[in-house]
C-alpha cells in the first residue's frame, strides 16, 4: 500500500460491477467492445497479473491500473484510468510507476501499452515512446460503445 497526497494505491481485485461503475467516471469507458462486455470485464478484473486501485480518503475509487506481466522481461498495461475530477494530479503516473515496480522494476522490464490518440501525450510525459517493432493479430470486429 502506498499513501500519497490524499489517496492510497494498493493491490486490490475489484468486482466487475465496481470496475464498470468506475468506468462511467473516466474516459476509459469507450475502449471496450459491446460484445459480452460484462463477462469479459469479469475475466479482466479476475485474471490481470497485477491489479492496482487508487482510493481517496472516503475510499472512493479514483484510479485503476491493470497489467499483464511475466515478472521477468515485459509488462503490458491493459487498463489505466483516473476519474475525470482527479486527472492531472499525478495519480496515473503513480499507478504506472507502482505497476512497473511490482512487475520487476525499470531495470528489468520493458513496458508496452496500446492507447488512443488522446492518451499519447500522457505516456510520452512518463517516458514511453511510440514503437514500430510490435506485431498485432487482430481479427475481431468490435461494436464500439461507451460505458454510461
Model-derived segments and spans:
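Conserved catalytic-core motifs of GNAT/GCN5-like acyltransferases
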Residues: 114, 124, 129-148
Amino acid at each position: 500500500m502506498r499513501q500519497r497526497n490524499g489517496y492510497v494505491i494498493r493491490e486490490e481485485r475489484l468486482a466487475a460491477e465496481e470496475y464498470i461503475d468506475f468506468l462511467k467516471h473516466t474516459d476509459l469507458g469507450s475502449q471496450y467492445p459491446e460484445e459480452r462486455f460484462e463477462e469479459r470485464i469479469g475475466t479482466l478484473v479476475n485474471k490481470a497479473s497485477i491489479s492496482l486501485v487508487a482510493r481517496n480518503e472516503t475510499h472512493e475509487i479514483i484510479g485503476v491500473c491493470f497489467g499483464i506481466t511475466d515478472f521477468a522481461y515485459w509488462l503490458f498495461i491493459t487498463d489505466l484510468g483516473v476519474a475525470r475530477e482527479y486527472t492531472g494530479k499525478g495519480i496515473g503516473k503513480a499507478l504506472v510507476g507502482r505497476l512497473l515496480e511490482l512487475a520487476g522494476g525499470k531495470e528489468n522490464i520493458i513496458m508496452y501499452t496500446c492507447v488512443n490518440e488522446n492518451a499519447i501525450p500522457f505516456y510520452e510525459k512518463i517516458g514511453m515512446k511510440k514503437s514500430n517493432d510490435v506485431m498485432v493479430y487482430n481479427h475481431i470486429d468490435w461494436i464500439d460503445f461507451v460505458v454510461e
